[in-house]
Amino acid sequence: MTSRRKLILASQSPRRRELLAMTGIPFETASVEIDETFDPALTVEKNVMAISKQKAEAVMWTLPQDAGEAIVLGSDTTVVLDGAALGKPGDADHAFEMLSALQGRSHEVLTGFCILHDGKAITDYARTIVEIGAMTPGEITRYIEVMKPFDKAGSYGIQDPLLACFVTGIDGCYYNVVGLPVSKVYAALKPLFPLDANR
């Protein structure tokens, strides 16, 4: 039976809401603040999956006993340059520093996700290589002033209009860079929300 199953996205990110909606699976949103500091003893891949699980668990623990068969999805995205993870910028100067380092070369974007259901956790991640062309200091400053990318890992949103002129290559899932590897997440959720065979 799937009628009582309810999918909950452990995020208030408008980008992740839009991406999860692409799966066609109805869902609600909820989020709880957690410490998203990376564990230096873990790889970046394990960190994004671990934080995704922590986000999902934090929401799962807040659900009432009569919440039905809840399925909670948590996700975490980071940008990796030369093996170092770049989180969200603290201010405009930090954002400028990040974008100055990213411009004119390629970097990795990793998104981990965790699906909690019936006491079990499904965790995975996706990796995308993004190449950003050369940007002048003025172009970087304008982007920061207009788009205010302070809630984005690496200080940029690949979907932002002012960045489109500088994205010179993508190897992997585009949606992963936006914040959720839609195809991988859908493949993991599909067995939990099977469609009628005649649809």
UniProtKB/Swiss-Prot annotation:
EC numbers on record: 3.6.1.9
Top class in the EC scheme: hydrolase
Essential cofactor(s): a divalent metal cation
Keyword Ribonucleoprotein annotated: no
Keywords: Cytoplasm, Hydrolase, Nucleotide metabolism
Record-level GO BP terms: nucleotide metabolic process
Known catalytic reactions: dTTP + H2O = dTMP + diphosphate + H(+); UTP + H2O = UMP + diphosphate + H(+)
GO MF annotations, alphabetized: dTTP diphosphatase activity; UTP diphosphatase activity
Main location, first listed in the record: cytoplasm
GO CC, alphabetical: cytoplasm
Site (Important for substrate specificity): 15, 77, 159
Annotated localization: Cytoplasm
Residue positions of the active site: 76
Gene3D superfamilies given in the database record: 3.90.950.10
NCBIfam families referenced in this protein's UniProt entry, alphabetically: maf (TIGR00172)
Function text: Nucleoside triphosphate pyrophosphatase that hydrolyzes dTTP and UTP. May have a dual role in cell division arrest and in preventing the incorporation of modified nucleotides into cellular nucleic acids.
Record-stated family: Belongs to the Maf family. YhdE subfamily.
Protein name per UniProt: dTTP/UTP pyrophosphatase
Source organism (scientific name): Chlorobaculum parvum (strain DSM 263 / NCIMB 8327) (Chlorobium vibrioforme subsp. thiosulfatophilum)
